[in-house]
Structures are given as structure tokens and as C-alpha cells.
Regions:
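Terminal peptide-recognition signature
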Residues: 10, 69, 141, 149, ...
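Short, basic/aromatic recognition patches
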Residues: 75-93
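Phosphate-handling DNA/RNA-contact segment within nucleic-acid enzymes
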Residues: 88-183
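TOPRIM fold recognition
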Residues: 4, 135, 151-236
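Serine endopeptidase catalytic core focused on the charge-relay Asp
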Residues: 66-78
Length: 236
């Protein structure tokens, strides 16, 4: 089904009139999933919000989306607190997902089959206390890691949680690092909870090069795991 959906999606998005034309395009761009097709189009600025109609943001209630949180061991109450449910149409086909807002009023969108962004890509910055910025900030790569961290706070995982109150920054992509640096300058303590991969380590290095002693790499807390959400899912 994924293969058929992918070909149909490419035909609609790129005005390919035949299956063979769509397949040739997929091969030329090394696209193998619906997710990759949409991400490639967004990157090329060919798949814009003008092609999305009837965009609606609602309280999160869809059973399959809540089940997705459960499959990632995210506390559903926390998920509902920080996320909304988004519905939209592309070429009259209905899509929906979990929406997480950013500073440019765009939204990161997730469902079990799709990972992307609607609107402008940007960081998300959340105050620990309403209208009151803290001296410390926790930095996450994606919002699922942030939600996983908040779930660990609720579980009172003392090994994992930073004791002092901090604000929260979600990069939503390591490509947003320059934007992030502008906002991190206000903080005296910066705690990096980034992915245990090359991109994550490079991002910590970039932040440390600018803010030096203010930065703590917190990845030792989940050294045997890919990221914060992986720790939550697999910890004993």
C-alpha cells in the first residue's frame, strides 16, 4: 500500500501524468517513502502551504494519534498539554497528525507514517513558568524528546531530570542551530539533551564553542540509548 500511495502522491505533487514518470522521478531523487517524498518537496519549496487546504487545529483527541504517543511511552496528558491535532488536505486528500507549534507559527507534524513541517520551520521556546524566564535552558532536538523528558519528570526519574527549574528549547531540526544561538545567549546554564549521533554531537559542539562553560552535555544520562525518547521507551 505504501508503494501505491507514494506513486499517487508524487503524481499529484509533481504533475506526473503516468506511473512510469512518477517512478522515474522517485528514482532520480532516491525517494523510497511517502515521508521522504514530502520532505524532499518541502526542501525544494515545491510543496507549500498554498497546496494545503482546510488546515484546522483542534484539541488532541484522535485515537490513533493518542495510541502513537502510547507506543512511544509519552504520557498522554503531557502530549495533550503541549500538542494539538492538525487536519489538512492536499489535492483533496485528507491528512491529519500531531502538531507542535514553533516561534514562527509553523507546526511540526507527526503521525505513525509522516514526519514533517507545515508553515515555516523554526525553533520552539517554552518558559518553565508563564511570563518568567529562568537562568537555565534545556535544549532538545525534536519535540518527542521534549515530551519524553516531561514524562520522565512526571515519573520522578531522579537520574535523568535536571533539578533546577529551566526553560525548554526544541530545535525541531539541527539546521536551526543559528536561530537557536540567538535565543540561548540570555541563559547562564544550557543543558543539551541532543541525539547520540554525529549530528547531535556536532550541535553540542557548536553550542559549546559559543557559550563555553555555560554548556553541559547531558547525553551521559542516556549514553546507551539513541536519544531521550529511546531512553524512556527502553529503560528498566
Amino acid at each position: 500500500k505504501e508503494g501505491g500511495d507514494l506513486v499517487e502522491l508524487v503524481k499529484r505533487m509533481y504533475n506526473k501524468h503516468s506511473v512510469s514518470d512518477a517512478l522515474a522521478y522517485l528514482a532520480s531523487k532516491n525517494i523510497t517513502t511517502v515521508d521522504k517524498a514530502i520532505e524532499t518537496a518541502i526542501a525544494a519549496k515545491e510543496y507549500t502551504t498554498t497546496k494545503m487546504n482546510d488546515v484546522k487545529l483542534l484539541p488532541l483527541s484522535n485515537h490513533s494519534l493518542l495510541s502513537y504517543f502510547s507506543s512511544r511511552r509519552i504520557d498522554i496528558t503531557i502530549g495533550r498539554m503541549y500538542c494539538r491535532e492538525i487536519h489538512y488536505k492536499v489535492e483533496q486528500k485528507h491528512y491529519y497528525g500531531i502538531a507542535f507549534g514553533n516561534l514562527s507559527e509553523g507546526h511540526e507534524v507527526r503521525n505513525p507514517y509522516f514526519k514533517g513541517c507545515i508553515g515555516h520551520k523554526d525553533i520552539t521556546l517554552l518558559a518553565h513558568t508563564f511570563n518568567e524566564w529562568q537562568s537555565g535552558c534545556l535544549v532538545f532536538e525534536g519535540f518527542m524528546d521534549f515530551l519524553a523528558y516531561m514524562t520522565l519528570v512526571k515519573q520522578q526519574d531522579r537520574w535523568f531530570v535536571v533539578e533546577s527549574p529551566c526553560d525548554y528549547m526544541i530545535l525541531n531540526s539541527v539546521a536551526n542551530i543559528k536561530r537557536a544561538l540567538q535565543y540561548l545567549d540570555r541563559y547562564t546554564h544550557i543543558h543539551c539533551f541532543l541525539d547520540n549521533d554525529q549530528a547531535g554531537r556536532k550541535t553540542v559542539e557548536s553550542i559549546s564553542n559559543v557559550f563555553e562553560y555555560r554548556v553541559t552535555d547531558e547525553s551521559f544520562r542516556y549514553a546507551d540509548y539513541k536519544d531521550v525518547n529511546d531512553y524512556l521507551m527502553r529503560k528498566r
